[in-house]
């Protein structure tokens, strides 16, 4: 493992300033359950890690007049047991419970789950120089690809491992991104980037930007939702395939029915 410096900003502004001044050898850390694995295995070799946990006020679930606001550093365990989420957004509640183990959910965060790196074993092997790491080919195309994409491959056949993303997208969630130029809000569905757009990244965050909040429109009384995740093992695992479903109505009167596939 390469040595690195740990930065502990006290505000979002300080974190953005560190990002702007640190070039491309810097990583953001929230819970650290994914990033520290990459660092230990030599897949990520940052000079600086910015620990967002030292910034106060980024863990919250609040109901406003037009949306539910969820802070990026909200623990997955807190999201899963929040009464508002359990009662009004069962699909999101189920997705949060589907992540990993209770121990990991106590540490992992909403922002970390939405911004994690892919689980492709070629990408995760520091000795394999795949396209996502600057190489010339996707080894999954003709190699071991049991867990890779059936559709939309080409440059890279990785799939995205987040359980929260399909559920939140089914609720038409918005991502709030902090930048040195001010905050910007966009649909969470537009937060992600296919390999054809940027082979080295899975989202559209710029080098001086960070995700600090997710917003979900207020639920309606007639809303129904669910999340299902199929795994190879009975114990915790990443999805072979997953689906989030959200609709309004009942019986034959369904409107705005959405099915978001993952895994």
Predicted ranges, named:
Residues 1-263:
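C-terminal structural segment of proteins
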């Amino acid at each position: 493992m390469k040595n690195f410096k740990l930065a502990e900003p006290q505000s979002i502004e300080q974190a953005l300033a560190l990002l702007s001044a640190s070039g491309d050898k810097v990583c953001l850390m929230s819970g650290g359950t994914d990033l520290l694995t990459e660092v230990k295995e030599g897949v990520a070799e940052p000079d600086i890690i910015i620990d967002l946990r030292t910034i106060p006020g980024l863990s919250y679930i609040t109901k406003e007049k037009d949306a539910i606001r969820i802070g990026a550093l909200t623990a997955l365990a807190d999201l899963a047991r929040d009464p508002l989420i359990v009662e009004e957004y069962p699909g999101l509640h189920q997705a949060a419970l589907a992540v990993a183990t209770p121990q990991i959910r106590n540490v992992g965060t909403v922002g970390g789950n939405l911004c994690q790196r892919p689980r492709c074993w070629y990408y995760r092997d520091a000795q394999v120089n795949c396209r996502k790491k600057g190489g010339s080919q996707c080894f999954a195309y003709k190699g071991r690809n049991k867990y890779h994409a059936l559709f939309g491959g080409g440059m890279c056949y990785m799939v995205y491992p987040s359980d929260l993303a399909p559920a939140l997208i089914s609720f038409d969630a918005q991502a709030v991104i902090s930048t040195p130029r001010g905050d910007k809000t966009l649909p969470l569905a537009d937060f992600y980037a296919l390999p054809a757009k940027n082979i080295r990244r899975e989202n559209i965050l710029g080098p001086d930007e960070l995700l600090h909040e997710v917003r979900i429109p207020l639920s309606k009384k007639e809303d129904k939702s669910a999340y299902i995740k199929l795994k190879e093992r009975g114990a915790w695992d990443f999805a072979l395939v997953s689906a989030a479903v959200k609709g309004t109505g009942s019986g034959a009167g369904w409107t705005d029915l959405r099915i978001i596939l993952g895994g």
